[in-house]
Amino acid sequence: TWIHQGNRQAATIAKRYHAVIAMNGDFFQFNNERYIVRQGKRLRNRPTGEDLLFIDSAGDFHVAHLARKEQITEVNDAVAALGRTVINCFSFGPILVEQGQPVFMEKTDYFNAAARKKTQRAILAQLGPLEYLIVSTEGPEDPGSKGLTLAEAAQYTADIARTLVPTGALYAYNMDGGSSNSLVLNYEKINSPKNPKKRAVSDIIYFASLVP
């Protein structure tokens, strides 16, 4: 992951860090609360009850639903029991897929994720050891597109994952969507090609190459 005190376009950040593919993160600098870990450093310890996504030092996902300090401690202890450490923890959500099944219900209100609104979605999923899936959808700002509610995004991600691996996604997690939704490949933003809007973001999740 990459974070910065200011905001930059995701493609600019990706180029600086030789990212082969990148997506926007959880825009955690929008407020000063939540539970946030980046590159092994805990930046905030003020959980506000969102679903959390933990990524450990082996690259595996762990989740906590509507997490408070007790649930956070449980996940950290479970990761430590594996001989690993938590490298990143994201606080946006919600969790959309768990053990191959969509888990988000349309009737649920979830913080600022616009649960029932059809909009752009950015989703990160784990399919297996060091195997991941990024889902980026268009929304009403894109000509000819309507976007997805969170429940629709959960089902869509679960369906895609099952076409790639028989067991589907281990976990899928909703990141900041809307105009922040940025999917970058080879330093170019490739999602929403008909929408010229490119919002600057404060953090990205990226997969990099050692070759400049």
What residues fall within each predicted segment?
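Gly/Ser/Thr/Pro-rich low-complexity, intrinsically disordered segments
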Residues: 1-212
